[in-house]
Structure formats: structure tokens, C-alpha cells
UniProtKB/Swiss-Prot annotation:
GO terms for biological process: glycolytic process; lactate metabolic process. It comes from Mycoplasma mycoides subsp. mycoides SC (strain CCUG 32753 / NCTC 10114 / PG1). Its main location: cytoplasm. This is L-lactate dehydrogenase. One of its GO terms (cellular component) is cytoplasm.
């Protein structure tokens, strides 16, 4: 029987997961939501709390409940945010051992449920964790999406907009590679309403030092937020909503997600942040830009860093 309503299952009902759910509910992207968590009581409490919005945000959704992995079977999208949170001063890659084990267990349960939809993952270190999930499940790589550098790119756009006093929505600027310290700002592709960002350097509105500082601030933003409030969740929650909405609406939007490289950008056998077209089939195609020599070298180094981390957890899926 043909389904007439979208169903989204969230695995990991902590701050990131519930921030995603609240944003998704406000935008009305799905009809049915299910929360799964290792601690059932908070999941049930969050489901009840969010259900109270039905009276305030009409037509936003039909049902929300705490559930189990069996609920994944007929879901359109499974969103995974489960894992240990990042500590102050800790890099994302330093979280890999524990969170990779957690993801292996989740992946096993999701596959066992008979799920055949699209998976969107934000658990850190997201590039490596997405790779682990795909290897353990054996799912079509196109149907497994990492949050990639969507948040990094959003931060970059905001910082460029602040520097030039323009709305961030008018800025097209992108971060590729690892969602982490080795990420790369792709300035050669950045523009403001079609005008290349490097033109602003030529006319004196920006300096190359400004661009370097903006990239550094983009990388450091997570550490700053974690030091101030122990976790980041609103920004990534909004980014997850954008990705899931693109899947459910078959938008064919180009987003900086974690997609599996198979020779694109001269790298392969890993997930990392690249521009990809997102629709009902997952990430449908990677867009390949002509990177500068410096950008390509930095991207290669970022991929090398990820490969080394992947090697440390290969025993989980080989």
C-alpha cells in the first residue's frame, strides 16, 4: 500500500536531536516522528513535551512518540545524532573510538529492522562515523548522508556577511573536507550575489588576511561555543532540518553534505564534506568544482587525516 505521509525516526534524543526535531516541527517537514534513545525516559519526556506544540503550531505534524528500532522499518528517513558529546578542548577526531562503537551497534539494529530509506547522520566525528555506519549496514552509499560541512559552511557565510555587512543568505561560501580542524574554505567558489569574493579583495573591501581569519574563526567556532555552553546544537539542528527537508521534498538542492567519494576531487573510499545534489534518493550526484592548487592540496590533506582515523576503527566493519 502506498504511503501518504512522511515518517522520520530520530536516534539520539539529546540536545542535537531535539533541536532538529523542534526545527523540523516548526517547518512542518514530516507527519510522523519517532524518538529512540538508549535512555527511554528522556525520549518519552521529549516526545510528550514536543507534542504540546500541536496546539500552538497547527498542521505541523500528526504524531510524535518514543519508540524502538522496529519503528525504523517503514520510516522514510532515519536521523542519527546519538553519541558522546564533545568535551571542551577536545577535537572531533578524538571522540572516534567510543562513538564508532556506538554507531556499530546502532547500524546493526537499523539494518535488522528492515529499514530501506535514507539515513542522515550528525554524530561526531561525522565523516568517520558515517563511513562506519555505511560499512556496517552495507546500505547503498547514496542513501547514507553525513551532515558534512553544512554547519561549517553556514558559519562561514555568517562571518563573511558580518564582515561585509550583508545578509548571510546573500553569501555563497563553502567549506569542504573534514567537519573539523582540517576543513577547507573554498574561496575560489565563493561569491556574493554572483560577484566573486576575491573581487572584494581586489577592490580593498577585504584582505587575504581577513579571509584567513574568517576561516580560522569558522574552525574555532565550535570550540568557542562548547567552552561557553558545553555543546552546540541549534545550528546543526537547523542544518539537519534542511537536509531532511531536501530528501522528503525531493528538492534536488545542492548542499555541502558528507558524501562518499569514489574518485571525485581525486580522493576515494571515504565520506567527507562536498557539494552534492540532495533528493528523495539521497545524495544523487557530487558536484565537482575546479579547485585551485592550494585548495586541492588542503583538501587532500584533510582526506588523508580522515583516512588515518578510519584506519583506527576498521576492525569494527572488516
Amino acid at each position: 500500500m502506498k504511503k501518504t505521509a512522511n515518517k522520520v525516526v530520530l536516534i539520539g534524543a539529546g540536545s542535537v536531536g531535539t533541536s532538529f526535531l523542534y526545527a523540523a516541527i516548526n517547518q512542518g517537514i514530516a507527519e510522523h516522528y519517532v524518538l529512540i534513545d538508549a535512555f527511554p525516559q528522556p525520549a518519552e519526556g521529549n516526545a510528550l513535551d514536543l507534542s504540546d506544540t500541536l496546539a500552538v503550531i497547527p498542521h505541523s505534524f500528526t504524531s510524535i512518540k518514543a519508540g524502538s528500532y522496529e519503528d525504523c522499518k517503514d520510516a522514510d528517513v532515519v536521523v542519527i545524532t546519538a553519541g558522546r558529546p564533545q568535551k571542551p578542548g577536545e577535537t572531533r577526531l578524538e571522540m572516534v573510538a567510543g562513538n564508532a562503537e556506538i554507531m556499530k551497534n546502532i547500524a546493526t539494529e537499523v539494518k535488522k529492522s528492515g529499514f530501506d530509506g535514507i539515513t542522515v547522520i550528525a554524530s561526531n566525528p561525522v565523516d568517520v562515523i558515517t563511513h562506519v555506519y555505511q560499512k556496517v549496514t552495507g546500505f547503498d552509499p547514496h542513501k547514507v548522508i553525513g551532515s558534512g560541512t553544512t554547519l561549517d559552511s553556514a558559519r562561514l557565510r555568517r562571518l563573511v556577511g558580518q564582515k561585509l555587512n550583508v545578509k548571510p543568505e546573500s553569501v555563497q561560501a563553502y567549506v569542504a573536507g573534514e567537519h573539523g580542524d582540517s576543513s577547507v574554505a573554498i574561496w575560489s567558489q565563493a561569491n556574493i550575489m554572483g560577484r566573486p569574493i576575491l573581487d572584494y579583495v581586489k577592490c580593498g573591501c577585504l584582505t587575504l588576511e581577513d579571509l584567513d581569519q574568517i576561516q580560522k574563526d569558522t574552525v574555532d567556532m565550535a570550540y568557542k561555543i562548547i567552552n561557553l555552553k558545553r555543546a552546540t546544537f541549534y545550528g546543526i539542528g537547523a542544518c539537519l532540518t534542511k537536509i531532511v527537508n531536501a530528501v522528503l521534498r525531493d528538492e534536488k538542492s545542492t548542499l555541502m553534505v558528507g558524501a562518499q567519494l569514489n574518485g571525485e576531487y581525486k580522493n576515494k573510499d571515504l565520506y567527507t564534506g562536498v557539494p552534492a545534489i540532495i533528493g528523495s534518493n539521497g545524495w544523487e550526484r557530487i558536484i565537482e568544482w575546479d579547485l585551485t592548487k592550494e585548495e586541492q592540496e588542503k583538501f587532500d590533506k584533510s582526506c588523508e587525516t580522515l583516512h588515518k582515523t578510519i584506519d583506527s576503527v576498521k576492525h569494527l566493519f572488516e
